[in-house]
């Protein structure tokens, strides 16, 4: 039987192994456990600082700040990328420093923790331009917050004010969050919110916002001033969460008017967008829209009419993706193709992708309707999968 050659790397001193890892890009360094058996334990030491901390929730801010400020990618003793905190024997906080200035912060709560309550959250981002940027420490530009609750949202807010270069924010799984205000007039460029089922009110003060991703029930949204999104995702298959039929959604329609990429549910077009632009139907168009992702619960003739009605507002559309999800909320509004746009021809539409269609008949009806509004000289590539 052939003898295995000795694992040379495993024989190296710990300090030298840590030194080697410190010069590797994060995505490469995380694969080192596959290289050597000893690297498995070395990798854990290189990225993880575990704290058994029995202080208060307010102490989280100080611990995380020290962790961030002490980070040095090229110093083996300071190249730790994960911090774990145990607070009050019931709260667990995980902070990960990822490549490209991304910080993930997740909260976990045991069954014995204090009862979570519904909460309103105002999150301010310091818009002052720093006079000088300290080259030491970890510079947070993208912050991902997971499962913030009524007990921790204030300490998170105080931490965010310290991130002077923050321009991207992701908030997810805040299950008791009912009202959220994002206040960043000049800094924030990217905002993503998902998995917040109780959210009823969203206020955005961010004049420079370029991308917005929202997943969940559509809340009442208040827009301050005007900003132009280049990409907007409204994955609101669960329908609306507001109860005000007089919702003023006009400012929201204006923010997505110049989007290049848009994800939309049919019901949102029928109940929200179309009523808000009814007075300017002849002139309102999504001039810059190149990619549309359309979500519906089925595709009968009325729903095809609704889609065609929207497409006629998009003269520059190039790519169309249609997803049928039977669990999607359905609007009861009646929509007909507007006569003012009856002669519109889509000259740039090249690709149509269909997903979730249950029958060939539905698919063929839609393709026929699309051919009616596509330029006769324009080849159309249709990709489809039957559910």
Swiss-Prot record:
Gene3D superfamilies associated with the record: 1.20.1280.50, Ribonuclease Inhibitor (3.80.10.10)
A Pfam family the protein falls into: F-box
Residues covered by the F-box domain: 6-52
InterPro entries on file: At1g61320/At1g61330-like, F-box-like_dom_sf, F-box_dom, LRR_At1g61320_AtMIF1, LRR_dom_sf
Annotated protein name in UniProt: F-box protein At2g39490
Native organism: Arabidopsis thaliana (Mouse-ear cress)
């Amino acid at each position: 039987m052939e003898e295995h050659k000795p694992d040379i790397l495993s024989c190296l001193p710990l300090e030298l192994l840590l030194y080697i890892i410190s010069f590797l890009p994060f995505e490469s360094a995380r694969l080192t456990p596959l290289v050597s058996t000893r690297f498995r334990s070395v990798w854990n030491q290189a990225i993880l600082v575990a704290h058994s901390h029995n202080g208060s929730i307010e102490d989280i801010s100080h611990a995380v700040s020290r962790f961030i400020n002490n980070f040095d990618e090229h110093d083996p003793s300071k190249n730790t990328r994960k911090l774990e905190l145990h607070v009050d024997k019931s709260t667990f906080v995980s902070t990960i420093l990822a490549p490209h200035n991304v910080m993930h912060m997740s909260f976990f709560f045991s069954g014995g923790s204090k009862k979570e309550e519904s909460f309103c959250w105002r999150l301010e981002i310091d818009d002052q331009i720093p006079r000088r940027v300290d080259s030491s420490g970890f510079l947070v530009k993208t912050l991902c917050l997971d499962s913030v609750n009524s007990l921790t949202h204030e300490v998170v807010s105080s931490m965010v004010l310290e991130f002077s270069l923050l321009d991207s924010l992701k908030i997810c799984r805040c299950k008791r969050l009912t009202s959220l205000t994002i206040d960043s007039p000049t800094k924030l460029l990217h905002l993503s919110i998902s998995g917040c089922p109780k959210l009823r009110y969203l206020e955005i003060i961010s004049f420079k916002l370029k991308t917005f991703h929202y997943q969940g029930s559509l809340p009442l949204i208040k827009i301050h001033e005007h900003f132009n999104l280049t990409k907007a995702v409204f994955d609101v298959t669960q329908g609306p969460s507001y109860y005000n039929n007089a919702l003023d959604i006009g400012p929201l329609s204006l923010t997505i008017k110049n989007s290049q990429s848009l994800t939309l549910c049919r019901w949102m077009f029928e109940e929200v967008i179309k009523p808000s632009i009814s007075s300017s139907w002849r002139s309102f168009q999504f001039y810059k829209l190149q990619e549309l992702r359309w979500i519906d619960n089925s595709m009968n003739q009325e729903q095809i009419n609704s889609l065609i009605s929207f497409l006629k507002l998009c003269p520059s559309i190039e790519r169309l993706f249609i997803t049928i999800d039977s669990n999607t909320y359905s609007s009861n509004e009646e929509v007909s193709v507007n006569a003012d746009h009856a002669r519109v021809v889509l000259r740039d539409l090249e690709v149509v992708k269909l997903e979730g269609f249950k029958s060939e008949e539905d698919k063929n009806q839609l393709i026929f309707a699309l051919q009616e509004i596509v330029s006769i000289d324009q080849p159309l590539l249709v990709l489809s999968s039957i559910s």
